[in-house]
């Protein structure tokens, strides 16, 4: 991920539920800042609960470098019970230059740095290229638009980027599915059942 961020030339979208103040968080932030400083359009979207310290730990540095940064459903009253609090941004996505993406369960956190007595977390992500990138790219840009509007922030004007190509890369088949608790609750399950025949 870090090498691909450093190689970016036009745009980066990063979405994460957790963005920790640890070695990984600082390394990713440094790479994103370097990209923004060299003119790459950097968009970082984190969850307002899962990454609740992001705004004080990393946001000033990213903004100073020229990155666009937002939090999804920021938590102002942590101990207040409201139904909307259950709706979080659990996606872990990175799209770089409309040419590659990382999709999976890996947050921006050092998974091996577990508190005393706890096992480290093991999660996975895949690096994607090829036609499936169109869907991933559309998903991150669409979420950015929604959160920009919902936050009543000045909508960051997004430059039109060349769409991902239709040329297959490798021999694996891939699909990108979005799951949430309302409209797409069972999409992934249905895709597994369909793929299994």
For the regions a protein language model found, what residue spans apply to each?
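Charged, low-complexity intrinsically disordered terminal segments
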Residues: 1-197
């Amino acid at each position: 991920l870090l090498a691909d961020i450093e190689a970016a030339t036009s745009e980066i979208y990063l979405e994460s539920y957790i963005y920790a103040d640890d070695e990984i968080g600082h390394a990713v932030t440094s790479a994103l800042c370097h990209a923004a400083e060299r003119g790459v359009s950097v968009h970082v979207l984190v969850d307002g609960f899962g990454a609740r310290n992001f705004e004080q730990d990393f946001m000033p540095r990213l903004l100073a470098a020229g990155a666009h940064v937002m939090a999804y459903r920021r938590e102002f009253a942590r101990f207040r019970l409201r139904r909307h609090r259950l709706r979080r941004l659990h996606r872990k996505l990175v799209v770089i230059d409309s040419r590659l993406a990382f999709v999976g369960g890996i947050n921006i956190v050092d998974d091996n740095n577990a508190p005393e007595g706890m096992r480290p977390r093991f999660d996975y992500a895949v690096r994607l290229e090829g036609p499936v990138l169109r869907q991933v790219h559309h998903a991150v840009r669409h979420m950015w638009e929604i959160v920009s509007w919902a936050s009543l922030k000045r909508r960051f004007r997004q430059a039109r980027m060349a769409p991902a190509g239709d040329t297959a890369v490798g021999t694996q088949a891939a699909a990108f599915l979005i799951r949430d608790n309302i409209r797409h609750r069972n999409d992934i399950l249905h895709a597994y059942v369909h793929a299994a025949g």
